[in-house]
Amino acid sequence: MKKHVVVYKKLAEPLLARLRAECEVTYFEAIDAGNRAAFAAAIRGAHGLLGASVRLDRELLDPALDLRIISTISVGVDQFDVDYLRERGILLANTPDVLTETTADTIFALILASARRVVELAEFVKAGCWTRSVG
């Protein structure tokens, strides 16, 4: 019997196909007021959850007696009551360091843009002032 996984974040179709090959999947591209009740009902029979950006509190997870793992597609775990998950024996997986290199790249790009006055000079060119010196 396949394990039941509830996905609550938009995923690329090839990833969903791989997951569906191994598991019974209930899929929500996003959670909102219109589908929150259906999401809560789906969680009740789930063995695993995969998603991000939705607060999964005790009230929502208490009825999920078969739940064994939650995997968040994010670095942070602030939307989870980690102590409660530990009490229940529910594993919590996240993606630590996934943004480390991107953050460093952004910082260096901002440093260079600031040092070379990129935004100021781009506005200068857009305004048609490129025929004179910036100084």
Specify the residue positions occupied by each region the protein language model found.
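Short gly/ser/thr-rich secondary-structure transition/capping motifs
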Residues: 28-34, 51-52, 125-135
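Structural motif corresponding to alpha-helix initiation and N-cap regions
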Residues: 13, 32-39, 54-58, 79, ...
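N-terminal glycine-/charge-rich "phosphate-binding" loop or analogous flexible N-terminal tail
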Residues: 1-48
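Phosphate/diphosphate ligand-binding glycine-rich loop within oxidoreductases
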Residues: 47-129
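Alpha-helix initiation/capping motif
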Residues: 12, 42, 117, 129-135
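Residues that scaffold the ATP/ADP-binding catalytic core of kinase and kinase-like folds
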Residues: 18, 121, 133
